[in-house]
Amino acid sequence: MNRLLLAGWIFFILLSVCTESFSGMVVSQTVAFHFQPHPDLSQFLVMDFTELTVPEAFIQKIGHAFSFFVLTYLLWKQRGSIRSAAAGSFAFAFFTEVLQLFFSRNGCIRDVLIDAVGIGLFYGLYVLAKRRKQEMYEKY
């Protein structure tokens, strides 16, 4: 069951990043792809955070973090190693942002960092929960 959930979540992320418009996918339920074989790879290095002042963009970036929080959880359940899950999620975040450049989307390092917030949040909660469990075990 975990494999199926993981595969489905990865598929959802890939569909979301490759479709021409995430908003179009959500609002009008249309999925369209526009492959660009020679993207401007320098766009990957853009670190413009002013876009986050737009509420819709900010909500979408929360979705980025949430997606990778969930992915990290699912990878952890599958692999059993939090470090492996976090590393796999981070590698996938990097991959998906580069992939977006080939589908006329704005893939950039800023979004990898936003994805890393979700990964780090799960990792941090995992460490806290593990520490709390260990403290409870030592207490009794």
Curated annotation (Swiss-Prot):
- What compartments host this protein? Cell membrane
Which keywords accompany this UniProt record? Cell membrane, Membrane, Transmembrane, Transmembrane helix
Bilayer disposition of the protein:
Multi-pass membrane protein
Annotated Gene Ontology cellular component terms: plasma membrane
Domain of life of the organism in this record?
Answer: Bacteria
Predominant location of this chain? membrane
Please name one Pfam family that this protein belongs to.
VanZ
Q: Does the keyword Membrane apply?
A: yes
Q: Which NCBIfam families match?
A: vanZ_1 (NF037970)
Q: What does this protein do?
A: May be important for peptidoglycan remodeling.
Q: What is this protein called?
A: Uncharacterized membrane protein YwnJ
